[in-house]
Amino acid sequence: MPKSTKPLIIFSHGNSFPGSTYGVLFQSLEARGFQIKAIEKFGHDPRYPVTSNWPNLVQQLADFASQEVEKSGQPAFLVGHSLGGFLSLMCAARHPQLGGQKVGGVLMLDSPVLGGWRAKALSVAKRARLVGSISPGAISRKRRHQWLGRDEVLAHFRSKKAFACWDEQVLRDYIDH
């Protein structure tokens, strides 16, 4: 007998967006009857170092999801944003059963899937060690990290086109976490 009747979503965040950034989304899903569990930050646990193609992060997700499935008694639906979507897909492919339950499904949100010549071009760029200079991780490493205060951070991000349409609470969660 399941320990919970609520469907279980294991959420994986995108690059530079800790799990807590998605609080508004999580609250909305919880209000609709889902359990939401998420790793707060991929790439920060020394047991799961970041390497090419993220096998350790996939294992971190599998280990986390297995524990949550065992606790809830429900199969996991793996949902991920950007990088998290890739991790979710790779996790389901490598671990179709988590915590003794078949994975319920995978949902990738804004994960740029490449195929054909684009995938081959990326593979060549990785082998030539060019990817590190143009990847989202390289871009995020160049971001400003020090501010005089929270109001300065809010003003900065509100003025950016990429953040202009963000819900106010989502922006505040992004800044706080």
Which residues are covered by each model-predicted region?
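Conserved HGGG/HGGXW glycine-rich cap/lid loop of the alpha/beta-hydrolase fold
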Residues: 3-47
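Alpha/beta-hydrolase fold active-site loops
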Residues: 7, 75, 104
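Glycine-rich His-Gly loop
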Residues: 11-14, 82, 111
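Active-site signature of alpha/beta-hydrolase-fold catalytic machinery across serine-
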Residues: 24, 90-94
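Active-site loop/oxyanion-hole signature of alpha/beta-hydrolase fold enzymes
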Residues: 41-79, 93-95, 99, 113, ...
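Gly/Ala-rich beta-loop-alpha elbow adjacent to hydrolase catalytic centers
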Residues: 80-84, 88
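Flexible "cap/lid" loop of the alpha/beta hydrolase fold
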Residues: 101-145
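Alpha/beta-hydrolase
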Residues: 140, 144-177
